[in-house]
Regions:
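C-terminal regulatory/interaction regions
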Residues: 57, 315-343
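Metallo-beta-lactamase
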Residues: 68-73, 78-80, 167-219, 223-295, 306
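Compositionally biased, low-complexity flexible segments
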Residues: 1-49
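Eukaryotic low-complexity, intrinsically disordered regulatory regions enriched
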Residues: 56-60, 64-67
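Active-site HxH/HxHxD metal-binding segment of metal-dependent hydrolases
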Residues: 117-119, 125-204, 301-310, 317-318
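Conserved beta-strand hairpin/beta-sheet module of binuclear metal-dependent hydrolase folds
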Residues: 74-127, 227-238, 242-244
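Short catalytic-loop micro-motif centered on adjacent basic/acidic residues
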Residues: 109-112, 137-138, 215-217
Length: 343
């Protein structure tokens, strides 16, 4: 387990944001929690969920079919193929989403857990990463394309890993809040996770095997979305930042809990990095990476709309759910290119 070595108090405005997202989290950082059937078995009173109630496999199949049809030709999604960004960061492609791994010394951290995806272990093998060695998984947010591999109906590749997740985001997992999409018109089924959890706060800093992980709360896409700054060099942004051909935007508008809040959060993130003169690699969940600070925040005051071609990248595949070009030979052939800048 990681060792906490610092942190900052949340601003009052940020605290107020969560008033409507469910009751306050009861457990402080470093308190491990379980949910679903495991919690019920432990006598916590949490509801016992039947296997048929769990959404991961159903949601994965829905996205593969329906969303593939919806987003074809939109030039929105541009995931990285499986491979290495540099000597420390690797990724696995799962259709439109990426899972990331950060390796330094003898420690490997995993950032997000993707879909409930049948080929994950195979593709990790392309990178020389054994699922059994993963002990720490940092979750940016609880959507099923970011937690699928650790949901209750997953194959259980990471049973030995602890999940690090924002204490506010955990409200979705406990059922205290419901995740809403399509401009908050539709409530998604509850995600069920039975693994140990470490609840994180804004500004928390962890030391895990000599690796420094700093947590930034960036609510908007979800109420408790976190981004993770690792060793002051790599910023894993989840679904906060969308890289188009002409720069970064706030993430897809139709999928946010609160778009105005998402814009404010992105602006606040830029300011934090600028004040500290940090220029990390910006590594996104669906649209690749860039090391260009100005490019990353070029349109931080604008939302990405999947129905407007002005937020697009002509280099994006026609159908990002078609991963036929994601191959083992490609994963072992050099480093993955960053997003090309189109001025």
């Amino acid at each position: 387990m990681g060792r906490a070595c610092g942190g900052r108090r949340r601003a009052a405005e940020t605290e107020d944001i969560y008033a409507g997202a469910g009751p306050p989290a009861r457990h402080a950082h470093e308190v491990r929690r379980r949910s679903g059937r495991a919690a019920a078995a432990a006598g916590t009173g949490a509801p016992v969920r039947k296997r048929g109630d769990e959404m991961s496999k159903k949601a994965t199949e829905f996205q593969r079919k329906a969303m593939s049809w919806m987003y074809r030709g939109k030039e929105n999604f541009k995931p990285l193929n499986t491979g290495w960004i540099d000597g420390n960061v690797a990724c696995v492609r799962e259709w439109v989403a990426n899972i990331f791994f950060y390796r330094r010394g003898g420690t490997t951290l995993m950032i997000d857990a993707g879909y409930n995806y049948d080929r994950l272990e195979e593709k990790m093998g392309w990178l020389g990463i054994d699922p059994g060695e993963i002990r720490h998984i940092f979750i940016t947010h609880q959507d099923t394309d970011h937690v699928g591999a650790v949901e209750a109906d997953s194959p259980g590749l990471f049973r030995n890993a602890a999940l690090y997740i924002g204490e506010t985001e955990d409200r979705y997992l406990t059922g205290a809040a419901r995740r809403r999409v399509i401009y908050r018109l539709y409530a998604l089924p509850q995600v069920t996770v039975d693994q140990e959890k470490v609840l994180l706060r804004d500004g928390q800093v962890l030391d895990i095997g000599g690796i420094r992980v700093e947590c930034f709360l960036v609510p908007g896409h979800t109420w408790g979305h976190m981004v993770y700054l690792i060793d002051d060099r790599y910023l894993f942004t989840g679904d906060t930042l969308w890289l188009g051909a002409d720069g970064g935007y706030s993430f897809i508008s139709s999928l946010a809990e609160d778009n105005r809040l998402a814009l404010r959060s992105l602006a606040a993130l830029e300011e934090k990095l600028r004040v500290r003169r940090l220029k990390p690699l910006f590594i996104t969940g669906h649209t690749g990476w860039t090391d260009d600070f100005s490019f990353a925040f070029a349109h931080r005051d604008r939302l990405c709309s999947p129905f407007r071609r002005r937020v697009h990248d002509p280099a994006a595949p026609y159908d990002a759910y078609d991963e036929s070009d994601d191959t083992e030979s490609g994963a072992k052939c050099g480093f993955l290119e960053k997003v090309r800048v189109h001025r």
